[in-house]
């Protein structure tokens, strides 16, 4: 499907963004729409970039991403995402999709749309939740059953920390988004 020109659509107006910056278009749209649908149209192959939204080493097709205004305003990388790729935004009126994707979006780890492969930038909505220490308490019965050595405890902590790597989170979030949009 060929990429179209980038438009901003709102209940009141429809503007073409070739003459107005995308940030200005978004500010105009935010005042009239409660929920925006973003359709990213990157200009290059993602073999040179990293993104939550698309797998690496593939050319990107149209992709709609539902975000609330509150989520957008909390992300510092949105403006740089907008500059690096074209996007379309329009209000969404499908309440079923809206509620399902709002739940997914609230737990997503965001990246900039275009970040150098060597130094990807990850944005986490609530870092306090992920940076909390992991504690494992074990009881040592008198007969020695269910005893965990210090090596076992350290291995369990390291395994849980490995599960929170940016690469694994990015892959898991991409898969969830693609599955939810496929339904």
Swiss-Prot record:
Record flagged with keyword Nucleotidyltransferase = no
Alphabetized, the UniProt keywords read: Host-virus interaction, Inhibition of host innate immune response by virus, Suppressor of RNA silencing, Viral immunoevasion
Which biological processes are named by the entry's GO terms?
A: symbiont-mediated suppression of host innate immune response
Enumerate the InterPro entries for this protein. Answer: Gemini_C4
Coiled-coil blocks: none
**UniProt key word Lyase:** no
State the source organism's domain of life: Viruses
Described by its record, this protein's role is as follows:
Pathogenicity determinant. May act as a suppressor of RNA-mediated gene silencing, also known as post-transcriptional gene silencing (PTGS), a mechanism of plant viral defense that limits the accumulation of viral RNAs.
Its name, as the record gives it, is: Protein AC4
From what organism does this protein derive? African cassava mosaic virus (isolate West Kenyan 844)
At the highest ranks, the source species' classification is: Viruses, Monodnaviria, Shotokuvirae, Cressdnaviricota, Repensiviricetes
